[in-house]
């Protein structure tokens, strides 16, 4: 009898072990369908496209770019950028490649973003957002079917170069001139998003502009000192950002029921500003200067062979790696916020929710302006994640 009981216990133990070891491990991205990630915009999302459009030696292809990953990879960071982390969370098993480079695996998406990209004008050795969308259309038939495109995520960050160039060329622009320019930029953004939607895309992630006046390169060029931002550029960014949510609400509201327009808006402006103003909460010890560069804010010349730029000892203590772009540590934070944060950060849903939301159903929620209560909540937090 005892032998039978021992055998039974042994069988149960074996069964328990097999059950435990065969149970799927819970990881970020579990239950996320096999969809793609497509990125559009400027150097913040450029995965290596810029080097295909110029014969000039580019700083992001030289050390110390890629320092945290041991090798420059054409990205404007010491390592990975936010879309790289987002792709991991979406369980995409390959790195999202630069679409303009030959012989790359675009089976799960591609980056069409190019450094120096704008919405308006004709950027030198770069592409406007409209040109990036048209490039996607050229590649679509040979690489992605309609169902894959409809269920994939299309992520856009664009406009910073438009406002930086405008401010340099129009230093004395009055309020009405500024407002007219913001309207021109956002109208063009709406048209380009509509073009992408007409190409079959249905799930959009729009990242608001950063507080451009707080970028180290802007502080340095406009001599703001170490503790001040250039508020004229911040005001332009805020005017731009205020138009994004209502614009996307309208696109979703007017889309036919047979082809829903789904979106979310990532509040990148406040994600940066919060880390600038309460840097200790996020273990950033320098937020007003760059890890790599020269000048009053170490904001110029990182990666240029003919510039003897300074390199910080520990890049993870910095919010910015160069004069305009964030460190890998910050990029990973933004990836987490994009994928899983609440509506104080990204609304009306995060990307995890957007991906699993049925592609054939209209959105039940819309973007709403942040309230004073939301602002007070942000300001009252201690060691917060946002």
Curated annotation (Swiss-Prot):
Glycosylation: residue positions: 105, 165, 288
Cellular location(s): Endoplasmic reticulum
Sorted UniProt keywords: Endoplasmic reticulum, Glycoprotein, Signal
GO cellular component, one term: plant-type vacuole
Gene3D superfamilies given in the database record: SGNH hydrolase
Location of the active site: 43, 322, 325
Record bears the keyword Transmembrane helix: no
Reported function: Involved in the control of the PYK10 complex size and possibly substrate specificity. May be exported from the endoplasmic reticulum upon interaction with MVP1.
Family per record: Belongs to the 'GDSL' lipolytic enzyme family.
Assembly and binders: Part of the PYK10 complex. Interacts with MVP1.
UniProt name for this protein: Inactive GDSL esterase/lipase-like protein 23
Species lineage: Eukaryota, Viridiplantae, Streptophyta, Embryophyta, Tracheophyta
